């Protein structure tokens, strides 16, 4: 059952190209302003909102006057370069009218899959959210190759949602949800307001993209749903063609909810604790053990020994002085730097390493403390 959007903690909103850009006139300014009002209302209600926005290529086509025919790869990348500037300015103007700051982040799918870049991207987005700014995230179509041809912003939005621990992903599109068959082809198609699990039968209901401006169809949205739901993020597919597309969901306008079976934090920590083989070990003192059990991050001062050859973002096991594993997490340093700062206070790290580094060796959001029974068995 759909909750009110204000009852969610962190929402990622993905916006399709056809919603933002009219082929003849360019940016749909009035629609974007209505979206800005919705985002402002959610932020004022205490909800963190992130936007994954398509539209750079579509907008860049109009800016550069490119022909309506299919674009070559280099033409698409040129259109993206021009469109990203126009798109970022439009979001800044619209949100700025409500006293809200925004920041543009250009990523590719590999940025959410390669662990070191993943940590950097997540830290940047987290900082924007702490500063009450709305991250405007777009696929970096000026340099992407495979992604630019297949249109992965739905999947990218799902990866951003899982990376940031969002509890809801909203895909705004030119269709109002999932039907048993593509409704533009089959007038007898039945609407599905709720999907518990994305099965092969559900996937068979997907069709191709109906709009020429959109690169993704229902199939990519269902792929996004599988990514999101598996990580504990619920997903909504709904039409964004209405003014105030987010408030329309709360008004009861048609939408399909794909419910997640568990909470995002639990899913993320399950992945850390169970699906990754530790690349190294950190032995910590009794004070660090106590801090970790109380929910704190692991600071370098409590680390007594570093074993293994690992890179930043790898999984490491945290051991007590008796050699028992008490926690596991993603480390913010490579092995060489971890050895240099082990045992030192956080305010000494920059001087030791010669660059500004993170205060925590493992942030509490990336750390799973094992239950006492598990630790004894380790």
From Swiss-Prot:
Protein residues bound to ATP: 14, 173-174
GO molecular function, one term: glutamate 5-kinase activity
Gene Ontology biological process: L-proline biosynthetic process
Protein name: Glutamate 5-kinase
Keyword Cell membrane: no
Reaction(s) this enzyme catalyzes, per UniProt: L-glutamate + ATP = L-glutamyl 5-phosphate + ADP
Positions with a binding annotation for substrate: 54, 141, 153
UniProt keywords, alphabetically: Amino-acid biosynthesis, ATP-binding, Cytoplasm, Kinase, Nucleotide-binding, Proline biosynthesis, Transferase
Family: Belongs to the glutamate 5-kinase family.
EC class: transferase
EC number per UniProt: 2.7.2.11
Pfam families referenced in this protein's UniProt entry, alphabetically: AA_kinase, PUA
Gene3D superfamilies, alphabetized: Acetylglutamate kinase-like (3.40.1160.10), PUA domain (2.30.130.10)
Intracellular or extracellular location(s): Cytoplasm
Keyword presence, Phosphoprotein: no
Domain PUA: residue ranges: 279-356
Role summary: Catalyzes the transfer of a phosphate group to glutamate to form L-glutamate 5-phosphate.
Record SMART domains: PUA (SM00359)
HAMAP family the UniProt entry points to: ProB
Pathway: Amino-acid biosynthesis; L-proline biosynthesis; L-glutamate 5-semialdehyde from L-glutamate: step 1/2
């Amino acid at each position: 059952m759909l909750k009110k959007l204000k009852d969610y903690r962190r929402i990622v909103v993905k916006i399709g190209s056809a919603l933002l850009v009219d082929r003849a006139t360019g940016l749909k300014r009035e629609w974007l302003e209505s979206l800005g009002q919705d985002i402002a209302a959610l932020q004022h209600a205490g909800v963190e909102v992130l936007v994954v926005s398509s539209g750079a290529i579509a907008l860049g086509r109009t800016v550069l006057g490119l022909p309506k025919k299919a674009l070559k790869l280099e033409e698409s990348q040129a259109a993206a370069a021009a469109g990203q500037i126009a798109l970022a300015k439009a979001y800044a103007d619209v949100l700025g009218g409500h006293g809200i700051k925004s920041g543009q982040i250009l990523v590719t799918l590999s940025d959410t899959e390669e662990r070191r870049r993943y940590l950097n991207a997540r830290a940047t987005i987290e900082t924007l959210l702490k500063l009450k700014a709305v991250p405007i995230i777009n696929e970096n179509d000026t340099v992407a190759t495979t992604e630019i041809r297949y249109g992965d912003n739905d999947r990218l939005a799902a990866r951003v949602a899982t990376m940031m621990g969002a509890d809801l992903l909203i895909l705004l599109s030119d269709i109002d949800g999932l039907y048993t068959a593509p409704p533009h082809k089959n007038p007898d198609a039945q609407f599905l307001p709720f999907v518990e699990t994305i099965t092969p039968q559900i996937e068979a209901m997907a069709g191709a993209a109906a709009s020429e401006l959109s690169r993704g169809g229902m199939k990519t949205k269902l792929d996004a749903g599988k990514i999101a739901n598996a990580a504990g993020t619920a997903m909504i597919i709904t039409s964004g063609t209405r003014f105030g597309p987010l408030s329309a969901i709360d008004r009861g306008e048609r939408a399909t909810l794909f419910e997640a079976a568990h909470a995002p934090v639990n899913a993320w920590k399950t992945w850390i604790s169970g699906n990754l083989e530790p690349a190294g070990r950190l032995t910590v003192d009794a004070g660090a053990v106590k801090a970790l059990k109380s929910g704190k991050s692991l600071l370098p001062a409590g680390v007594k020994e570093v074993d293994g050859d690992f890179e930043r973002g790898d999984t490491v096991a945290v051991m007590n002085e008796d050699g028992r594993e008490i926690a596991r997490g993603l480390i913010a340093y490579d092995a060489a730097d971890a050895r240099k700062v082990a045992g030192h206070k956080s305010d000494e790290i920059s001087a030791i390493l010669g660059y500004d580094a993170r205060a925590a060796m493992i942030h509490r959001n990336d750390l799973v403390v094992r239950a006492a029974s598990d630790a004894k068995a380790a």
